[in-house]
């Protein structure tokens, strides 16, 4: 008789085969016009429970271009493991044909040519079509939002998240968890959450003063679907006050709190839960470690690190699902729950090809209503790009190279710094750069561009600190995101060295001189977590730079030399 783990491993193989026929092994297609919506949505119902997962939408209401990372390095046990495999290696692992839709959706190479053929991705009106299609087959499917939803665009900033709240309410989620939402400030978050028609979950959101669970955010919610009791436990981003300004939400503390997670799993099991789902914003590697430490979790729906995987990853008896970002994918998971336990599943990562999937008319109209008061500002053309502008990658992206150049020129600095965030769409060569495009990569509630003086020693400390957040071998010390971007300076990094000795050969580009630890340099940056930061907003800095230059031509930077890979 098969053990449950053996059964899940067999089920994993079935998921792989299903993913290959439904996603990864489409015939090579010259252009997206040869795809059709039925191919994207095709799914043979399985079991008695369906989950729908979206995460890290970052307020992208409309279709976009989005290039996946070229470099996404893993360290320690994550070395050479997904999601730390990219490009052709990723395609070989999953049996994805070169030139296929899956190639375009999941990997970075040949992006410009393939974007011309396959077009834009995402758009919440298209996401709505996918959700409605699944619900037509499974009316009681659970829709779960992994957070980073009310942040990341011009309209989201100016409405304090209300545009996204309105549109997501129309999609009718059953639960969500949180990260960037808290940068709206705790008062605004409370105002929204108190009026949500669905569960706002976070087992690790605590009252900072009393170190007790925060009343506004229940740890879990119980559902009955397909004749089975299901517990959904929320896991908000653990490192909120470190990665984001703690002064914006001083009432709350976070942390991984895996001991409390175990207590919650045990509690819901005692209440009769036959399926335990964790809706997580930990990041994929943190979720893998948590799955190995907390027993009794059946499914982790992973968010934060923006990974998109066409197959689940099995850790012990827990499957982990990664559903990408920016509205580019929707995951469907069908589960067979029998006699109080999960016996198997089928999974499909559905890419949202915007020219193939028809928009839901009601949601499309609702999106247009949110944008209408701002449409003139959104559509104003600031310049044109001759280059591919993208963000994702451990060390640099051309969007951030552009932002760093703007900071140096507009703020008259020696060195510039841009945060290694992973959100923000891409721009293809020949595309106009609108104000909306600029805000899509800069919009945040603490975006002032500071100009200050740092010693060479302090710059080194900053780089070492961020590098440890990214390349610490223990996932519980990783905060997600990528390396801080640097303009005006080059350096070498050995990702396998210990903290304090990873960063060497720091050089000021305009003189070719080594950075002097005792010398002071003028540094401009943005997204400081410090309260009362002064300076112009970063989107104004970038807009002024692009408007003045008109045509943007920028090649990927090679100013970071990477060792240890």
Predicted regions and their residues:
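Secretory targeting signals
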Residues: 1-2
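Residues within the helices of the helix-turn-helix
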Residues: 5
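Catalytic centers of hydrolytic enzymes
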Residues: 38-120, 124-130, 136, 249, ...
